[in-house]
Amino acid sequence: MPLHKSAEKRLRQSDRKNARNRARKKELKVLVKNMQKLVDAGAPKPEVEVAYRSAVQKLDRLGVKNYIHANKASRKKSQLARILNEYGKAE
């Protein structure tokens, strides 16, 4: 436990930021999983494209604001795009 008042404040701030970061990353995981579920279920391509766009939008936002590394955001976008393109060819 912190002994100084400033250390207590930093601990509180750190806990709040940690909770926010976890929530944002969880939202991203949910969006990516939703797209993958649609692909696995054989949903129509327009539905998969909507899920793809929302996941990419979230990835861009988190990458720009440094919640995840920009290269990781780019890599995930590329992976999702590859899944979407292969899904289009399979039909």
UniProtKB/Swiss-Prot annotation:
Lineage: Bacteria, Pseudomonadati, Chlorobiota, Chlorobiia, Chlorobiales
Superkingdom assignment: Bacteria
Compositional bias per record (Basic and acidic residues), positions renumbered to this chain: 1-18
Annotated GO biological process: translation
Pfam families tied to this protein: Ribosomal_S20p
Function (record text): Binds directly to 16S ribosomal RNA.
InterPro entries xref list: Ribosomal_bS20, Ribosomal_bS20_sf
Stated name of the protein: Small ribosomal subunit protein bS20
Record key words, sorted: Ribonucleoprotein, Ribosomal protein, RNA-binding, rRNA-binding
Species assigned in the record: Chlorobium phaeovibrioides (strain DSM 265 / 1930) (Prosthecochloris vibrioformis (strain DSM 265))
Region (Disordered): 1-25
GO MF annotations, alphabetized: small ribosomal subunit rRNA binding; structural constituent of ribosome
Chain ranges passing through the membrane: none
Similarity-based family: Belongs to the bacterial ribosomal protein bS20 family.
GO cellular component, one term: cytosol
